[in-house]
Regions:
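Short, cysteine/histidine-rich loop/knuckle motifs that typically chelate Zn2+
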Residues: 70
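Short Cys/His-rich "knuckle" micro-motifs
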Residues: 78-81
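Charge-rich, low-complexity linker and terminal segments
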Residues: 1-10, 14, 40, 89-170
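A positional/architectural concept
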Residues: 1-67
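Cys/His-rich Zn2+-binding cysteine-cluster or related metal-binding knuckle/ribbon modules and their
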Residues: 64-65, 85, 128
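Aromatic-residue hotspot detector
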Residues: 28, 87-89
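Cys/His-rich microdomains that often coordinate metals
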Residues: 75
Length: 170
């Protein structure tokens, strides 16, 4: 079955071509081990085809549902990102150290950009999503404060005697 994120580039003329993709819940659920479950993201792709390579410029904007790290409730996180990828025609055995350079074999006629879309969207989300100050579930915030372990004010003078002997070595 052909994916909505596959681009048949074999018949494309040399030049720039524009594409639009709608990334939604079904996209995220179709990917194994996806960290994102729900979201709506609009993606624009400018694909410049040349004789020996294709240069892709992705832009995305939208929002995703994630779990707030403070109160464990759902928070809407905005996604706004760009990604540039170079698809170079050549042997797949060629090694590259550049994450934005992808080798494409000469006999390939379609380009599946779903991995690049997921990577761009995932990297645009915060590692620790939080509600704005004052928007968290108050009941949960109170419970966290109630059970939070208080830090003891341990002075530097309370050093283990074995370690204090090392201070005299200077």
């Amino acid at each position: 079955m052909k994916s909505a994120f596959e681009i048949p580039f074999a018949g494309l003329k040399v030049g720039t071509h524009e594409y639009e993709f709608d990334v939604n819940d079904s996209f995220f659920s179709s990917l194994p081990y996806s960290l994102v479950e729900k979201g709506i993201v609009k993606v624009w792709l400018d694909l410049e085809k040349k004789e020996t390579m294709m240069i892709a410029h992705f832009e995305c904007f939208g929002h995703m549902e994630q779990i707030c790290s403070r109160c464990n409730e759902i928070v809407l996180v905005e996604v706004d990102a760009e990604l540039d990828v170079i698809y170079k025609f050549g042997s797949l055995e060629e090694e590259t150290n550049d994450d934005n350079l992808i080798m494409v074999s000469y006999d390939t006629c379609e380009l599946d950009v779903s991995h690049q879309l997921y990577e761009m969207i995932s990297l645009a989300t915060p590692a620790r999503p939080l509600h704005e100050e004052g928007e968290c579930n108050e009941e949960m915030v109170e419970l966290i404060a109630k059970y939070q372990v208080k830090e003891t004010n341990k002075k530097d003078d309370d050093v283990d005697p074995r370690w204090s002997a090392l201070k005299g070595l200077n």
